[in-house]
Amino acid sequence: MKRSSYILGLLAGFAALAVSCDLTENVQVKADKSMIFGSKSGLELYSNSFYKALPTLKNGFMQDKMCDVGAVSNTDTFIKQGAYNTETATSWSWGALKNINYFIDGCNDPKYCTVDAETRDNYLGIARWFRAWFYYDKLTTYGEVPWFPNNIQSYQNDVMYKDRDSRDVIIRNLIADLDFAYEHIQATSSTGSSTLTRWAAAAFKSRVCLFEAAYRR
């Protein structure tokens, strides 16, 4: 009898435990602004998300396959007449820019960004380098595109659907971003060549200027 009572007590305890545990509870994975912009580690972790925009080693080489660096067996779709139109083109995406501009706006907000100016500007430089990378791709693909210096909210339809800006506006802002990156990115070398240095800003600026000069010639 005592044993039966003991077993029943255990079962009742397990039942109560099962009722009190919410096995479907969602894990909170969203960090607030103070967690991101209030420390160097937060800035570093967020800025790591920008690097996925860079091409892989293979893609970096194959981007030049339309020139004489290697032999290919087919013509790239990019240069085929009529291959792209507004319905089939896949590069008119702005998600990466929203991610970057959110970070830039946060770094410039003293309410949340409480790190020292040198640390802040270092990560601002990294973000602005990637914004330049984003816009260089858009410029070489479409020419004139709208320039968005800040993060846009979903209700700002008048800003979201504004007209395209001129090449002069895009190039001026693009070079300003790269100049800022060169002046403020602290690293001059990278272990494993896996993160940006100030020399990446200088090298990328030379490519941007060469492309635009050749276009305007």
Task: Give the predicted meaning of each segment.
Residues R128, A202-V208:
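TPR/Sel1-like alpha-solenoid repeat signature
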Residues G60-S73, P146, T195-T197:
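Short, solvent-exposed turn/loop segments enriched in Gly/Ser/Thr/Pro and often Arg
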Residues C21-M62:
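Membrane-proximal, proline-rich intrinsically disordered regions
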Residues L139-T140, P146, S189, F211-R216:
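Short coil/turn linking the two alpha-helices of tandem helical-hairpin repeats
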Residues M1-Q28:
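Bacterial Sec-dependent N-terminal signal peptides
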Residues M35-L45, S73-Y142, N157-R172, A176-S193:
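Conserved, well-structured interaction surfaces
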Residues F148, G192-A203:
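Aromatic-lined, polymer-binding surfaces characteristic
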